[in-house]
Amino acid sequence: MNITKAFCLSIALLGASNMQAITNSDFVIQQDNTKINNYQTNRPEASKRLFVSQAVEQQIAHIKQLLTNVRLAWMFENCFPNTLDTTVHFDGKDDTFVYTGDIHAMWLRDSGAQVWPYVQLANKDAELKKMLAGVIKRQFKCINIDPYANAFNMNSEGGEWMSDLTDMKPELHERKWEIDSLCYPIRLAYHYWKTTGDASIFSDEWLTAIAKVLKTFKEQQRKEDPKGPYRFQRKTERALDTMTNDGWGNPVKPVGLIVSTFRPSDDATTLQFLVPSNFFAVSSLRKAAEILEKVNKKTALSKECKDLAQEVETALKKYAVYNHPKYGKIYAFEVDGFYNHVFMDDANVPSLLALPYLGCVDMDDPVYLNTRKLVLSNANPYFFQGKAGEGIGGPHIGFGYIWPMSIIMRCNTTHDNEEIRKCVKMLRDTD
């Protein structure tokens, strides 16, 4: 990782990766005209912060000393601890529930991404390490409640979506089937294990969860049943909050890919083989296979993960690649096995743009590079440009809006330092 890319990951993804090597001359963006004393903290009072980590506070102080741009330093100071300050509910033992921002529910995807930047500091702070282990254990528990659900309540209090026409339970906040909901917990657990060496998280709860992941993925390959066991309908004015065909969605041909009824934006898929999420499933299954083999000594279950990953990867190469008249070979966003394709990208991760960030493809993969050119151009119907910046949005927020997440992914999927600087400047100027 080059220094400017590490800087970008620090500021944009709240990660502070490899920042120890940075000096003030490594990354310079022109100062704005705001006086330093106008930048005041937006953090809660110390007594009202939900979780405090000395390792995180030390990292904030360290990074601020390295930054020459006052506004970026101010943004980092407010953004990096925000998850700990406002969303983490740790019981002090082995359970952590993470609110997704202002919604008092825990998304498997969001929680896995929210605490990700703190894993690198876990070995410096025992309480932080315990809190992170608690997130992972809670995620496994959630999967075992219902592997088809995307968001969970802290207890069994029910919620606003209990009337959805699907198999709702009081523990669920929402039950939208999204492949990535089962991938993010594996990714987080693997990263935690590799960073800390702590394998205690891979208990019987984990073994039950990964068995359910495999079962769910295979069900949604639709080989045995063209519909599968999952259906979803909602009474709503938003077309993308419900599914066609009485809740089953548009048909797919069973070719080895996995159906994702909803996107990571929580919007319904058009063609149900969502390509970025299938790539994410491949990388996650291989991580799970390594854990099962090295930690649990479950060689048969490990092989099952490897075999499924290989099957999905083979199907992606055959059905997800399209020879575009302008950009050459590219990855489609969605396919259905009948050789129909959707060409676009959405800001939410996993996305086509974010594939290298998630470790799904190499950043220099020629098909990815062609795809990247397409999704960062007007050939992507959800790529927008304005006076303040440019980037990818999505139907969840509508026309003319870009999500900072897409700018973040853009600067983490390039070797070009000038492109990285451009992205960081946009993030700074549009906060």
Residue ranges and their predicted role:
Residues 104-132, 136-240:
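Aromatic-rich carbohydrate-recognition surfaces in CAZymes
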Residues 108, 144-148, 152-155, 167-170, ...:
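Extended ligand-binding clefts on enzyme/binding-domain cores
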Residues 387-431:
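C-terminal hydrophobic structural anchor segments
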Residues 22-109:
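Low-complexity, Ser/Thr/Pro/Gly-enriched N-terminal "stalk/linker" regions
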Residues 8-15:
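Bacterial N-terminal signal peptides
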Residues 1-8:
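Bacterial N-terminal signal peptides that target proteins for export
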Residues 75, 126-142, 199-218, 288, ...:
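Extended, well-ordered alpha-helical scaffold segments
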Residues 54-68, 113-126, 184-199, 279-298, ...:
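Well-ordered alpha-helical scaffold segments within catalytic/enzyme domains
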